[in-house]
């Protein structure tokens, strides 16, 4: 049996997810070019809320207040927003109604500047080069990456305002953004770590 994942722990690219949630809202049905029906539902657990995209007849059975277990689901970005999907072998099983502790905030499906920057970096890297090694090297000097690094290490007044608007995302984002800076010892021109440049200036 797969261990259950909390909504706060869902990240883009994760697969084989098992998530227990309550349905808060069911969105309207949209039709794809292929004739499939897609419904986006807002769901939550005690750690926050997220959108789930439900395809075809499964969407007709989901009602607000349903407590559902997603099995073999996956997470991906849709228009820069984190979204859960059922996947090919995925399953939604109703296990109850109404009685579940949940929190609507933070909403992990709100547009996250960190995810948008990652998407633009990967698209820019794919346009510049098709290889994975050049992809990593070419994405670091891109303007979106420097904006993220400035919010992490410099004393500029602009980026901290963005961090305060989404405290749940910035706390986790701050950790992930600082890790690549420490793994690039040969990049002294980056603005990522102001402490190192101050130490070398005093010596």
Curated annotation (Swiss-Prot):
Any one Gene Ontology molecular-function term assigned to this protein's record: DNA binding
GO term, biological process aspect, one: double-strand break repair via homologous recombination
InterPro entries: NA-bd_OB-fold, SOSS-B
Compositional bias ranges of the Polar residues kind: 149-182
CDD domains: SoSSB_OBF
Annotated keywords: DNA damage, DNA repair, DNA-binding, Nucleus
SUPFAM superfamilies: Nucleic acid-binding proteins
GO CC annotation: nucleus; SOSS complex
Main location: nucleus
Biased composition (Low complexity): 118-140
DNA-binding region coordinates: 22-92
Region (Disordered): 110-203
Compartment annotation: Nucleus
Complex formation: Component of the SOSS complex, composed of soss-b (soss-b1/nabp2 or soss-b2/nabp1), soss-a/ints3 and soss-c/inip. SOSS complexes containing soss-b1/nabp2 are more abundant than complexes containing soss-b2/nabp1.
Family to which the UniProt record says this protein belongs: Belongs to the SOSS-B family. SOSS-B1 subfamily.
Function text: Component of the SOSS complex, a multiprotein complex that functions downstream of the MRN complex to promote DNA repair and G2/M checkpoint. In the SOSS complex, acts as a sensor of single-stranded DNA that binds to single-stranded DNA. The SOSS complex associates with DNA lesions and influences diverse endpoints in the cellular DNA damage response including cell-cycle checkpoint activation, recombinational repair and maintenance of genomic stability. Required for efficient homologous recombination-dependent repair of double-strand breaks (DSBs).
Name recorded for this polypeptide: SOSS complex subunit B1-A
